[in-house]
């Protein structure tokens, strides 16, 4: 093999996952490798179309390397030579159940979370609860902000506040000129917190209660309000991976 071909060939990293020998390109995460091998790992904040954030921790797995074993988020952990991965042990199931219980404490009415909880054997309501004024269906996964910035290119929404007051909102908590009304944020929301509804002949984007006049959409060049969004924003953007991640 010539030096040029050798340099161009991707480096394959051998490792073990659930007792199986495997090898993937350098830089592949444990989650990506597992999905390619048909191993199911639940996720909420992960989407192939955008950068990894590692917010929900539902995809936790057990990794052993260098004589050390620990739990870690599979979406952010790159495979390495000699790595041993386990995706379904009692400790992992216990950790995932705790994650879902904590998410349900903040978002007790989120149907997708309830479905994941049922699959993991978690009873609802759980052991924990936020104060009613701090409860809503947003789990702070950041998918809406990431897709708005990285795919749409608008960067119209972002995180604000800290701690239990953290929220994803438009800048200055009001509709911004940066928003083009494509509703891609609605498409990727894993808990259906973001919705678009027609109120008194005005389209309002919940949960931000924002409305806007008609403007030209930079995606299709058509004139539309924030309410008249594209039925399939993922298809319009030319990507097919904006499905909601609900196991």
Q: Language-model segments: which ranges?
A:
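Signature of N-terminal electron-transfer/Fe-S-associated modules in redox systems
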Residues: 1-123
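A structural motif detector for beta-strand N-caps
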Residues: 188-189
